[in-house]
Amino acid sequence: MTGHATVWGVRISRVVPGRAVTGDEVRELLSGTGATVREAVRLAELTTLRVGGPAVLAECGTTEALVATVRALDAAGVPVLLLAGGSNLLVGDDGFDGVVVRVATSGVELGADGVLAEAGADWDAVVAATVAAGLGGLECLSGIPGSAGATPVQNVGAYGVEVAELLRRVRLLDRATGEIRWAGPGELGFGYRTSVLKHSDAAVVLAVEFALRPDGSSAPLRYRELAAALAADEGESRPAAAVREAVLRLRASKGMVLDPADHDTWSAGSFFTNPVVPADRIEQVRAAIHAHVGEVTIPTYPAADGVKLSAGWLIERAGFGKGWPGAEAPARLSTKHTLALTNRGTARAADVVALARTVRDGVAERFGIRLEPEPVTVGVRL
C-alpha cells in the first residue's frame, strides 16, 4: 500500500505495519539519489531538545538529492520523517521506524528586494545575510533556531512579525504527482503558527523566497518590549541591523538563542502557543483567572478570532514558575522563560512529555484554557 498519511502530526508515508527498515535496505533503495545513508542514528543528536531514539538517516545535501530521495521512499511505501534544524521537534525514546530524511541544503541568493533560500539553510544565517545586505523585514525573526524551509510550515513569528507577511512564494515537491511547483502565500492557509503545510503531508518545501525592504529599514515595530529597547514608538521603523541586535539581546535574556553550554537553551523554543480565546468566552476566562490569582491585570492582545492571551503568563500564574519543578528534575521549565521546556542534560523524551502534560493540565484545571503544543511530535502523545 502506498500513499500519504499524517500520524502524530508528522508527514509520513502510509505503509502496512511491519518491521523497521534496515540501513542496507535503504542504501539499496536510495542508490543513485545522492543521499548519504547512516543507521542507528540517535535523533537526540539532531534536535535542539536533545531527546529522541534511533533511526535510519538519509542526508540530502542538494535539492536534487532531496527530491529523488523522497520520490524513491514514497514509491516504496517507506515512512518518511523530514528533518532539518530539529528545533521544533519532539521525538520519542523509541525513535522512528522509517527513514529520517535530513534536509541539508544550504543555498542562499540575495536580490535587490528579497532573498531566496533553500529549505535546509540555517534560518538565522539567512536573516543575518539579509540584514548585512541592507534588506529589511526579517530582523524581528533573528535568533530563531531551525531551517528556512520550516518557517512557512509553522508560519514562524516573533516580536510582532510573521512569515506570512513577507513570504513571496515557496517551492514545493508535490508528493502525490512527484511534480515541483511554486506556490504563493494565498495557497498556504496561513494562521497563527500554522499553515496547510503543517497539517498535510502532501508537499515537501524545497525553497522559500521573501519580499524585503530595499532601504534597509525594519518592519514596523509592533512589540512593546522591542520598541522600548530601541527607544521607539510602536509602529515606527528603525534600521534593520539595530533591530536585529536588540532582538538577539532580548532572546538571549530569555534563553531563546541556542548555546550548547546553557541548558536553558536545550529546548524546542516556546513549547505552547499563545491561546486565542473566543470573544464570547473571554469574560468567563477573566473570572476564572481572577478567582485563582486575584484582581490582576491580564495581558491580552487582539486576534482575528478573539483575544490572545500569553501562555507564559498563564503558566506562571498557574503555579509553574521559572525552573519548575526544581534543580533535580531532568526536564524542567527554563530558569529564564516559563514557556520553554528544557532538557537539563539527562532528560529522555518521556521526561519532557510528563512535564508538558503536568503544565498543560494545571493551566486547564485552574483557568479552563487548554494550551496547545507548538512542536511537531513523533512517537509520543501529549
From Swiss-Prot:
Keywords: Cell cycle, Cell division, Cell shape, Cell wall biogenesis/degradation, Cytoplasm, FAD, Flavoprotein, NADP, Oxidoreductase, Peptidoglycan synthesis. The keyword Cell division applies. One of its GO terms (molecular function) is UDP-N-acetylmuramate dehydrogenase activity. InterPro entries: FAD-bd_PCMH, FAD-bd_PCMH-like_sf, FAD-bd_PCMH_sub1, FAD-bd_PCMH_sub2, MurB, MurB_C, MurB_C_sf, Oxid_FAD_bind_N. Pathway: Cell wall biogenesis; peptidoglycan biosynthesis. Pfam families: FAD_binding_4, MurB_C. The active site is at residues 193, 270, 374. It comes from the Bacteria. GO terms for biological process: cell division; cell wall organization; peptidoglycan biosynthetic process; regulation of cell shape. Transmembrane segments: none annotated. It is found in: Cytoplasm. Its cofactor is FAD. It catalyses: UDP-N-acetyl-alpha-D-muramate + NADP(+) = UDP-N-acetyl-3-O-(1-carboxyvinyl)-alpha-D-glucosamine + NADPH + H(+). Its EC number is 1.3.1.98. Belongs to the MurB family. Cell wall formation. This is UDP-N-acetylenolpyruvoylglucosamine reductase. It comes from Nocardia farcinica (strain IFM 10152).
